[in-house]
A protein has these predicted regions:
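A short, exposed helix-loop element centered on a Lys and neighboring polar residues
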Residues: 109-110
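A hydrophobic alpha-helix adjacent to the NAD(P)-binding/active-site core of NAD(P)-dependent oxidoreductases
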Residues: 46, 89, 97-98
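Conserved NAD(P)H cofactor-binding loop of Rossmann-fold oxidoreductase domains
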Residues: 77-82
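Conserved glycine-rich Rossmann-like NAD(P)H-binding loop of the short-chain dehydrogenase/reductase
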Residues: 24-38
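Substrate-binding pocket helix/loop in short-chain dehydrogenase/reductase
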Residues: 85-86, 93-95
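The beta1-alpha1 cofactor-binding region of Rossmann-like NAD(H)/NADP(H)-dependent oxidoreductases
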Residues: 49-59, 91
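N-terminal Rossmann NAD(P)H-binding glycine-rich loop of SDR-like oxidoreductase domains
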Residues: 10, 18
Length: 122
């Protein structure tokens, strides 16, 4: 059975990717700040993780390593976007967007690389 890890799964595209992957008989690992939407679906392993928090990411990877998880597909779907015009966007909002969309995605990928099968895909 192939394993897929998807970030940003509490709603929208990430949520639907998990549901579709489960229907295709993948082992599904969901990573999201809010894991509640998928927690009660049998066959989906949910992790509540803020990808901007390096300690939480390290704990996630250590847990997956302890369970001897090998990842075949990594889908970096987590993202942050505020519906604001450029001139109204605060520094904090820009920073949060980059922390999630750039640094968080890079860090989760970097930390998960040892668990991704040689034939795996990011």
């Amino acid at each position: 059975m192939k394993t897929i890890l998807v970030s940003g799964t509490s709603s929208g595209i990430g949520y639907e990717i998990c549901i579709q992957a489960l229907e295709l008989k993948y082992k599904v690992i969901s990573v999201s700040r809010n894991s509640k939407p998928l927690e009660n679906i049998k066959g989906i392993d949910c992790y509540s993780v803020d990808i901007t928090d390096n300690d939480q990411l390290k704990n996630l990877v250590e847990d997956l390593k302890s369970k001897k998880v090998n990842i075949d597909f990594l889908i970096n779907n987590a993202g942050h976007l505020k519906n604001e015009t450029f001139d109204k966007t605060s520094y904090e909002s820009f920073k949060q967007t980059y922390d999630v969309n750039v640094f968080g995605l890079a860090q989760i990928t970097r930390l998960l690389l040892p668990l991704i099968n040689k034939s795996g895909h990011v």
